[in-house]
Amino acid sequence: MTFPLEKALDVMVSTFHKYSGKEGDKFKLNRSELKELLMRELPSFLGKRTDEAAFQKLMSNLDSNRDNEVDFQEYCVFLSCVAMMCNEFFEGFPDKQPRKK
């Protein structure tokens, strides 16, 4: 039996490795790999924005060790931040249905 959180972790890891190493280090996302991942896997996050300056700023913010690539740890920090933003967004809505047990 697969549990939802285990499945989520599997998807998180496998998605990273699906895009990493297409052009270089197989354990890191370069600029174009990250952009492809975001466009294909998180299109709602980018929305209609294809602003190159905004993407460059995101890349710069994610690349904490300044090697011009995003490693798995940096990727996880990014996903954690996105998850926290989603949680904060939904905290503003009143509960209309009882919580599942």
From Swiss-Prot:
The keyword Hydrolase does not apply. Its main location: secreted. It is found in: Secreted; Nucleus; Cytoplasm. The modification N6-acetyllysine is found at K7, K35. SUPFAM superfamilies: EF-hand. Coiled coil: none annotated. One of its GO terms (molecular function) is calcium ion binding. Calcium-binding protein that plays a role in various cellular processes including motility, angiogenesis, cell differentiation, apoptosis, and autophagy. Increases cell motility and invasiveness by interacting with non-muscle myosin heavy chain (NMMHC) IIA/MYH9. Mechanistically, promotes filament depolymerization and increases the amount of soluble myosin-IIA, resulting in the formation of stable protrusions facilitating chemotaxis. Also modulates the pro-apoptotic function of TP53 by binding to its C-terminal transactivation domain within the nucleus and reducing its protein levels. This is Protein S100-A4.
